[in-house]
Amino acid sequence: MKWLLLLSLVALSECLYKVSLIKKKSLRKNLIEHGLLKDFLKNNTLDPASKYFPQGEAATMIANQPLVNYLDMEYFGTIGIGTPAQEFTVIFDTGSSNLWVPSIYCSSPACTNHNRFNPQESSTYQATSQTLSIAYGTGSMTGILGYDTVQVGGIADTNQIFGLSETEPGSFLYYSPFDGILGLAYPSISSSGATPVFDNIWNQDLVSQDLFSVYLSSNDQSGSVVMFGGIDSSYYTGSLNWVPVSAEGYWQITVDSITMNGEAIACAEGCQAIVDTGTSLLSGPTSPIANIQSYIGASENSNGEMVVSCSAISSLPDIVFTINGIQYPVPASAYILQDEGGCTSGFQGMNIPTAYGELWILGDVFIRQYFAVFDRANNQVGLAPVA
């Protein structure tokens, strides 16, 4: 029996490629330090809903991915594009599907402060005549699509289509800690029909299992990781509980209920949720979120943050997400974010009109508590408490 267990663990880790994620200061913190956040918030509406289910023409022509919604992101990984590889810091985002980075064709202030891809310095780059447009709150990032080899955690992903930005509106992006985005959602929401990175990796038989997994460390600058092609059981305790994907676009699942102190605070008759590494907070409909903010004593400060008394953490209850019959508690020490500047709420209101009814986003606040496996082969998400 022990040998069988050992063999199964070996099989799970076979062809497992890891990308280390580094925890950095968020764009919000950078803007606060430079005295720019108030101007930024005045000119940019912070609307997490705008990332999901774009309506009308935007749904087919544009990847609706306002970068204002990455304001609080802290986890970033490094990839290489081209031959020889040019390095970029990206967000590994399960809430979008395109890969894009700044290019030398972009002269916007945001691009000048970041790594820019130079096609002329890559012997494997192939140009196309296709264009890419990604909507921001204040305009669009426009660019072109090309093909090249992308190095991801030791995988050489050849002939990968990606976006090269030509314009990036908004001087605030000058201070962003990332260069671009690597989307890990389904191909159905990819702009311009571009094949997502993980799909291309799987199609080339570069990994042994059609899945990837994510571990986010709560405290350390390092230790967080995205794993392609396998599962490392040392990152979680107990067994993985599997949840069917309810709609193949985002990593969307059905939630049975959301409770605090045993009472339903939202989702009493079930609701939908998207497991999104590219969203830092727990987002939900504005009405129940407002009730939660009131319950935990959160109030808005001049920086638009919902501030909470740090001393309240020990007395506040867990918020419990029941998913596929299993309870997933998130303690106050996780949903209240602490740093040297004090304590802020990890909840954020948004309204998304969808055919699925009430929608929640389980962002990094949730994923720091639960190791997540994104299983494309079986269209399911695996969750287990982090080790």
Swiss-Prot record:
Regulation of activity is described as: Inhibited by pepstatin.
Any S-S bridges, and between which cysteines? C106-C111, C267-C271, C310-C343
Signal sequence, start to end: 1-15
What does the entry report about how pH modulates activity? Optimum pH is about 2.
The listed locations are: Secreted
Q: Highest taxon of the source?
A: Eukaryota
Indicate yes or no for the key word Zinc-finger. Answer: no
Which CDD domains does the UniProt entry name for this protein?
pepsin_A (cd05478)
What family is this protein classified in? Belongs to the peptidase A1 family.
Q: State the protein's name.
A: Pepsin A
* Originating organism: Callithrix jacchus
